[in-house]
């Protein structure tokens, strides 16, 4: 599909699929189409922080410092299969890696969206009344319960299909964030820390497709320093 960035890399174990990302323009187009939708703010958070789906769904308001423009990743929501019942029930657990617990910066646009979302959530809570189950979650069902990861995935895939954009998974927003950051010249160690990777080597291995653009940017930067405007 035209405009889709599909990169075949030797990914870490368990990640043998093609690495798929959107361009900045495609991401902007999708976010614009989500305005007013329940997915708008969680997608914006993922797209501007590189957080995993479970980390986004596990966010609590106590993890956010809106004045400082940062959030703390402390837990993740998943839905593993119960061996006794065969059901996939939402459970909270530790982030995926040892360095998964981290502090993540957020741009002003995301902070503003979260402030608006908090007000809307408070209004919805009053409408539900005493039946509202307060788990302190940033993103929850209308009754306050955690959003099932599979249901969230289905909603996201539905909106992507309707958008006319190349098909991506929610996790590909994380890949898109990292790729755009590296191509913009953000140091790989900084990106690695924001993503919660165990080490910078993992970041460079996964996103090696971004290195040529980084090298070109470095060359232009050095040339500007040496030769100035001449």
What is each of the regions a protein language model found here?
Residues 40, 44, 176-179, 201, ...:
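A broad detector of short, well-ordered amphipathic alpha-helices
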Residues 27, 111-114:
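A generic structural signal for short hydrophobic patches within well-formed alpha-helices
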Residues 58-64, 192-198, 208:
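A short, basic/aromatic helix-end/turn motif that makes direct DNA contacts
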Residues 1-2, 25-27, 44-77, 81-83, ...:
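Short, charged phosphate-coordinating catalytic segments
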Residues 3-9, 14-21, 32, 68, ...:
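C-terminal secondary-structure termini that scaffold catalytic or DNA-interacting sites
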Residues 115-119:
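Arg/Lys-rich amphipathic alpha helix in sigma70-family domain 2
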